[in-house]
Amino acid sequence: MDSLVTANTKFCFDLFQEIGKDDRHKNIFFSPLSLSAALGMVRLGARSDSAHQIDEVLHFNEFSQNESKEPDPCLKSNKQKAGSLNNESGLVSCYFGQLLSKLDRIKTDYTLSIANRLYGEQEFPICQEYLDGVIQFYHTTIESVDFQKNPEKSRQEINFWVECQSQGKIKELFSKDAINAETVLVLVNAVYFKAKWETYFDHENTVDAPFCLNANENKSVKMMTQKGLYRIGFIEEVKAQILEMRYTKGKLSMFVLLPSHSKDNLKGLEELERKITYEKMVAWSSSENMSEESVVLSFPRFTLEDSYDLNSILQDMGITDIFDETRADLTGISPSPNLYLSKIIHKTFVEVDENGTQAAAATGAVVSERSLRSWVEFNANHPFLFFIRHNKTQTILFYGRVCSP
């Protein structure tokens, strides 16, 4: 399963570069885990070049051989069941099944809803073996709807399901024109996350403060402040600080990568984005680079909500055939040779405030005052990167860039 986590993280950075390439100054927020799982569902039923392209872009091809040499005994029964589906896609799905089960089992201290579902035109029969695999490994189903005769009803049905899965935070996933009578297969992907900080911010310490958007422009934001013990480090290679803010009981953390303050903060951010890789992220967030220090923390309150039409993004990354009616091979999903993926939409919502990610009551730990000279300052008053990680599995659940809170 470790190789799956590695593959997901590499895909995270690749996707971030693709989303942000046309605008280096916009906010970005997405869930690499949920997207990888969603595309893993498609991979389970993809064949020939359609499968190979997914493997390449999501780095699935980099771990299958290594994992099969030293198979995880916990997955022995799963692999036996998956083997009849397709050797490589079965292996990918087995590891997703284990990872998603781990996340489901231990989320009593936070809410994480990964809403993945395929909606297919009812004229296309679905292979029972594929249905069984999706339920077993991805904890979801494929729904048959009448796109041809009633696309608007289908759109409303999909939107309602997503709104329920996201506790009402994600509405109108598909706009009125997004679904039509030509639609045949839609992959729905929405994520909702809610957790409390291990050490909350006192509302009384939140103040209006300037946030440097670029070399010439500032913006007034609500800046939360806190003194406490945090894991913090400095990355000499990119001249940036890295700080860990833990959620309740430390099962998940938000890591913030903050370039050193300069005349043009965006240049520092661009340099950080260019150099970040999976291997460097592991090193930068390790105990060798980070230590617990007394920190004066200033962090902006912010809300990010975004929607990504991933068809063109994934095609630019190399996944092309599954979107092409003449080239798609999804015969593992349906025996029909005409099935192709019409649309992938990814929508996310995050709200960071004094209590945590999403508003919730919290009780803060008391930190005794120390000599002011011993405090390290971490002032996120200019653009930064952040990611939310499940610490036990090292899985990046969310990744983002804040240029304008």
Swiss-Prot record:
Major localisation: cytoplasm
UniProt function note:
Inhibits trypsin and plasmin, but not thrombin, coagulation factor Xa, or urokinase-type plasminogen activator. May play a role in cell differentiation.
Q: Where is this region: Disordered?
A: 64-83
- Give the site residues for Reactive bond: 370-371
Could you tell me the keywords of this UniProt record? Cytoplasm, Protease inhibitor, Serine protease inhibitor
Compartments reported by the entry: Cytoplasm
Is the keyword Cytoplasm in the record? yes
Q: Which organism is it from?
A: Homo sapiens
The entry describes its oligomerization and partners as: Interacts with SLFN12; as part of a pathway regulating cell differentiation. May interact with USP14.
Q: Which GO terms describe its biological process?
A: hematopoietic progenitor cell differentiation; negative regulation of protein catabolic process
| Pfam families (UniProt xref) | Serpin
Tell me yes or no: is Cytoplasm among this UniProt entry's keywords: yes
Q: Known Gene3D superfamilies for this protein?
A: Alpha-1-antitrypsin, domain 1, Antithrombin, subunit I, domain 2
Q: Which cellular components does GO assign to this protein? A: collagen-containing extracellular matrix; cornified envelope; cytoplasm; extracellular space; ficolin-1-rich granule membrane; plasma membrane
The entry's note on the tissues where this protein occurs is: Expressed in many tissues, including brain, bone marrow, lymph node, heart, lung, liver, pancreas, testis, ovary, and intestine.
Q: Which gene encodes it?
A: SERPINB12
Q: What is this protein called?
A: Serpin B12
Protein family membership: Belongs to the serpin family. Ov-serpin subfamily.
Q: Name one GO molecular function term.
A: enzyme binding
